[in-house]
């Protein structure tokens, strides 16, 4: 009989089957081990993926986060370049300004804090005395101009009250951490406010202040001590948090001067109009950077290893514009716009016909680039302009989908509550010489004449007949006043401004050739001037559409629309030998040290007509102006100079009618001088003048051109007609009762200068009531006649003492004081006819004896 242990395998199996817990425990150990391995693998994969994500996939982002936490990247502002006139006078510059701001929530000296015992809530109450003290001191400094002249501030003025209230309102926002007190503050005021706040905070520091030190601090602030109930000096604890942020301001020292040319910058210092915009990349420069370590508070740590990338300051613009010429142009243009109640602004250009350099360019009314958003000075004009051009400016109602609302007749409904602020600004910012089209009228006859002469279809002596009416197809053309000029040559036709002659000349040239010349003279493209917003919209008949009627109307300037600057470049080409040049305002670009970086040379685009044809055009234009005694162009004549010119009276582009039913007009005049070898062109245009006397440009625009020439020709040293008039005398005409503009013309023709004693623009249309020297007086050639429109007596002035001065300097002193001058002998002044210090009429001739 076998024992139970005689079969080991069976015994073992019996033991296993008999211990199920052991078997379960073993299985769990295997599962646990597998799970542990799996977890380790998953964890490892997670770590690997995280490392991949941090180091590789998103590494750049995390490195940037780390750098931002550790490094402080500060911008170094580049200094914007300045703009100068041709002689170096600053027209636009950049200055450092400061924004003064406060942190009312941290200005504990201005508030009393109480705590509710139940809710533990804190309540801050303004300390009226402290608030008044701080607001007063800050306001006085803001209005002082220099931070020091506090006593000069009128504390009763509206300006003071407004500024004081603004400061108080800002500091009263006790839960705010940022409140602006003032902007565009100069450095002197900023330093004064900082010193005041520093001293104030020292006096009110929580650490306490000794009585002696407190007395000194309060005395420095100009404040007395307060006393406690026991009579000891006390001061309220706390501080005022006022800081300054640096900024830059673009300054235009002459205000509205050349505003349409210079343009302006926005609040971020970027050029948005005019030269500021077209030369933005040149003027702006490139900002620099400083990269330093920062501490836990985000502040820079002083570190000699800081990395700095220097800013590259902007370059300067030196213009061809001359402030002296620009001043003359703007003065006379302003007078003309006011005197003739010009509804749609006026513009003027003075340009070198050979190089294209623009010496002056103006549009009036305009704006102040120091505050371009302000249109209040032009509001009346702007309102009238918007009302006069409803199809251009009216704002119409729209539904929620942006569709126009219409009335029962299908017409769009005007929005009576619309805001025209943006429209007003856009209008006043426009440079009229390059942004607006107009029919050039008879000024274009110069171009038609050039076409005819250059093509061989006409000469100076080509005679055509004007019977007073001329029909083309079904269209009948007349001359002004329906006058019949009879037989006339090219020069006579230009002087007579004969429409019929030039219609016939246009027919001789023919549509195809006329268009080719029109294109060659630059009327189908931009002039390329270095100013922004030159219109790209051209309104003219293509060669295929230039039919016989269109050709006839185009020949005398009443069918194709152009810009004033296009007219100037075309007329320049007609007289300078036939070369179409690109006009430009910038003469050169310099760096911050004045070194020339780039010069803007003459760009000849092409030769349009021959030199011989150009010579003929110069001759007929000079015939138009003559000696001032014949033809409307004579109103632009200035004695002593050879001047060529042409007037143009055209209908407005939109063919609007005035209240009297006639079409609104545009009056313009273009002159060149010296006529035999032109150097400059002077152009004036008045858009929709409302002169009760006339519409003719020869009466409205030509005198303005003549007045400009009378002052700038001597200044520029323009060659005279060669006649020596020194020592000659001129009889002063009787100008009493004459309109101011006509008085100017008469004096220009005689070689006398003029000065309007009362030069307010609203008086320029008035009659002359008094003149000195008086009518009939024999005076030296070039004498200035003082004209008055508001008095029957001349104004007196004190005669300066010019003895011992050179003759030239003495003349300057006397002219500046309002006197004429004659000189006998040479050397220094030995005696003068009017005693020094005596009071005599302005315009009096002071005779000097030199030796």
Where are these regions (language model features)?
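Acidic/histidine-enriched alpha-helical segments
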Residues: 150-169, 342-355, 465-469, 532-535, ...
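Soluble non-cytosolic domains of exported or imported proteins
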Residues: 78, 125-132, 183-187, 269-273, ...
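Periplasmic/cell-envelope proteins involved in peptidoglycan metabolism and beta-lactam response
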Residues: 1-413, 437, 512-519, 638-639, ...
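Beta-lactam-recognizing serine transpeptidase/beta-lactamase-like catalytic domain environment
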Residues: 92, 98, 295-309, 354-443, ...
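Sec-exported extracytoplasmic/periplasmic mature domains
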Residues: 139-148, 198, 266, 284, ...
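Extracytoplasmic
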Residues: 76-79, 86, 93-97, 176, ...
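Ligand-recognition elements built from short beta-strands and adjacent flexible loops
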Residues: 600, 640, 654, 684-851
């Amino acid at each position: 009989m076998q024992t139970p242990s005689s079969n080991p395998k069976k015994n073992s199996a019996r033991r296993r089957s008999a211990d199920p817990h052991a078997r379960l425990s073993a299985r769990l150990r295997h599962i646990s081990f597998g799970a542990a391995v799996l977890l380790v693998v998953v964890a490892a994969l997670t770590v690997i993926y995280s490392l991949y994500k941090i180091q590789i996939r998103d590494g750049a982002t995390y490195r940037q986060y780390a750098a931002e936490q550790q490094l402080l990247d500060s911008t170094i502002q580049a200094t914007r370049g300045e703009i100068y006139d041709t002689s170096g006078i600053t027209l636009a510059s950049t200055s450092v300004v400061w924004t003064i701001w406060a942190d009312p929530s941290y200005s504990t000296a201005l508030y009393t804090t109480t705590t509710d015992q139940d809710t533990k809530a804190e309540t801050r109450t303004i300390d009226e005395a402290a608030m008044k003290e701080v607001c007063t001191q800050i306001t006085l400094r803001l209005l002082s101009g220099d931070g020091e002249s506090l006593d000069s501030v009128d504390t009763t003025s509206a300006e003071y009250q407004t500024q004081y209230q603004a400061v108080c309102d800002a500091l009263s926002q006790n839960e705010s951490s940022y409140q602006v007190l003032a902007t565009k503050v100069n450095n002197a005021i900023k330093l004064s406010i900082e010193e005041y706040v520093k001293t104030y905070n020292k006096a009110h520091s929580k650490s306490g202040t000794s009585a002696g030190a407190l007395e000194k601090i309060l005395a420095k602030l100009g404040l007395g001590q307060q006393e406690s109930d026991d009579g000891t000096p006390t001061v309220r604890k706390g501080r005022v948090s006022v800081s300054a942020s640096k900024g830059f301001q673009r300054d235009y020292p002459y205000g509205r001067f050349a505003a349409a040319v210079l343009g302006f910058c926005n609040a971020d210092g970027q050029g948005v109009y005019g030269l500021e915009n077209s030369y933005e990349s040149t003027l702006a420069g490139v900002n620099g950077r400083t990269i330093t370590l920062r501490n836990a508070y985000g502040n820079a740590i002083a570190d000699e290893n800081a990395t700095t990338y220097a800013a590259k300051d902007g370059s300067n613009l030196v213009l061809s514009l001359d402030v002296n010429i620009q001043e003359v142009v703007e003065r006379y243009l302003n007078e003309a716009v006011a005197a003739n109640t010009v509804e749609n602004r006026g513009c003027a250009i003075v340009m070198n016909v050979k190089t294209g350099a623009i010496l002056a360019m103006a549009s009036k009314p305009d704006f102040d680039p120091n505050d371009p958003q302000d249109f209040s000075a032009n509001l009346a004009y702007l309102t009238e302009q918007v009302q006069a051009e409803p199809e251009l400016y009216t704002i119409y109602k729209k539904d929620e989908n942006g569709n126009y609302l219409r009335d029962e007749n299908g017409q769009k409904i005007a929005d009576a509550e619309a805001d025209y602020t943006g429209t007003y600004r856009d209008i006043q910012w426009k440079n009229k010489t390059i942004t607006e089209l107009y029919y050039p009228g008879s000024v274009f006859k110069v171009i038609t004449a050039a076409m005819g002469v250059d093509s061989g279809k006409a000469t100076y002596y080509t005679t055509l007949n004007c019977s007073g009416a001329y029909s083309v197809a079904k269209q009948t053309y007349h001359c002004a006043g329906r006058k019949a000029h009879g037989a006339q040559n090219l020069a006579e036709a230009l002087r007579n401004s004969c429409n019929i002659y030039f219609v016939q000349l246009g027919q001789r040239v023919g549509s195809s050739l006329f268009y080719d010349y029109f294109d060659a003279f630059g009327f189908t493209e931009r002039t390329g001037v270095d100013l922004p917003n030159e219109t790209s919209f051209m309104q003219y008949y293509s060669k295929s559409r230039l039919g016989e009627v269109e050709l006839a109307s185009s020949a005398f300037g009443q069918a194709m629309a152009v810009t004033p600057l296009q007219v100037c470049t075309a007329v320049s080409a007609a007289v300078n030998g036939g070369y179409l040049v690109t006009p430009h305002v910038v003469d050169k670009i310099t760096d911050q040290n004045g070194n020339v970086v780039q010069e803007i040379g003459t760009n000849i685009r092409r030769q349009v007509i021959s030199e011989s044809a150009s010579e003929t055009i110069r001759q007929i234009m000079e015939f138009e102006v003559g000696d001032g005694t014949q033809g409307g162009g004579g109103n632009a004549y200035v004695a002593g100079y050879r001047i060529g010119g042409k007037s143009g009276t055209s209908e407005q582009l939109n063919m609007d009618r005035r209240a009297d039913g006639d079409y609104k007009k545009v009056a313009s005049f273009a002159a060149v001088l010296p006529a035999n070898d032109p150097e400059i062109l002077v152009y004036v245009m008045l858009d929709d003048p409302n002169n009760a006397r006339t519409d003719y440009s020869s009466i409205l625009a030509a005198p303005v051109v003549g007045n400009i020439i009378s002052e700038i020709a001597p200044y520029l040293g323009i060659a005279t007609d060669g006649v020596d008039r020194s020592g000659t005398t001129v009889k002063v005409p009787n100008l009493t009762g004459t309109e101011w503009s006509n008085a100017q013309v008469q004096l220009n023709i005689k070689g006398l200068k003029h000065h309007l004693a009362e030069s307010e623009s609203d008086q320029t249309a008035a009659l002359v009531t008094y003149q000195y020297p008086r009518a009939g007086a024999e005076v030296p050639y070039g004498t200035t006649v003082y004209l008055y429109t508001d008095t029957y007596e001349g104004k007196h002035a004190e005669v300066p003492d010019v003895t011992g001065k050179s003759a030239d300097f003495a003349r300057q002193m006397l002219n500046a004081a309002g006197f004429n001058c004659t000189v006998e002998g040479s050397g220094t002044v030995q005696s003068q006819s009017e005693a020094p210090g005596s009071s005599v009429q302005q315009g009096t001739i002071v005779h000097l004896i030199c030796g």
